[in-house]
Amino acid sequence: MPNFAGTWKMKSSENFDELLRALGVNAMLRKVAVAAASKPHVEIRQDGDQFYIKTSTTVRTTEINFQVGESFQEETVDGRKCRSLATWENENKIYCKQTLIEGEGPKTYWTRELVNDELILTFGADDVVCTRIYVRE
């Protein structure tokens, strides 16, 4: 079983602004979000298939608790409430499908994968994919 536990700092980010645009976030809010999310701090606790993930930026902190294979509530990148279901896509990768609770929007998901001691995080909105690579602190 992969060990996602630890504190992580972002090494690189691709397509975050494009992701926010695909989610319908206006230009002014995108600028604020991109600046605030340029140095996120991520803390992950893991006990088998049980995860706690806390992501902190200068403007917002999000926390999620989930068990792989069980539905849970969280928010999309742009703050809309959704039901999510995380599953193991392979032995080192979690895939999480998000379904909006209210309203309509693009199909969203996230993945977290361990590759050579890096955490690869992807966010997707329809066919737009944002990739963020983290290293352990």
UniProtKB/Swiss-Prot annotation:
Gene Ontology molecular function terms on file: retinal binding; retinol binding
Gene Ontology cellular component terms for the protein in this record: cytoplasm
Residues the entry annotates as binding all-trans-retinoate: 132-134
Keywords for the protein's UniProt record, in alphabetical order: Cytoplasm, Retinol-binding, Transport, Vitamin A
Localization: Cytoplasm
Classification via InterPro entries: Calycin, Fatty_acid-bd, ILBP, Lipocln_cytosolic_FA-bd_dom
Source taxon at top rank: Eukaryota
Motif Nuclear localization signal positions after renumbering to this chain: 21-31
Domain notes: Forms a beta-barrel structure that accommodates hydrophobic ligands in its interior.
PANTHER family assigned to the protein according to its UniProt record, in alphabetical order: FATTY ACID BINDING PROTEIN
Function, in words: Cytosolic CRABPs may regulate the access of retinoic acid to the nuclear retinoic acid receptors.
Family: Belongs to the calycin superfamily. Fatty-acid binding protein (FABP) family.
UniProt name for this protein: Cellular retinoic acid-binding protein 1
Lineage: Eukaryota, Metazoa, Chordata, Craniata, Vertebrata
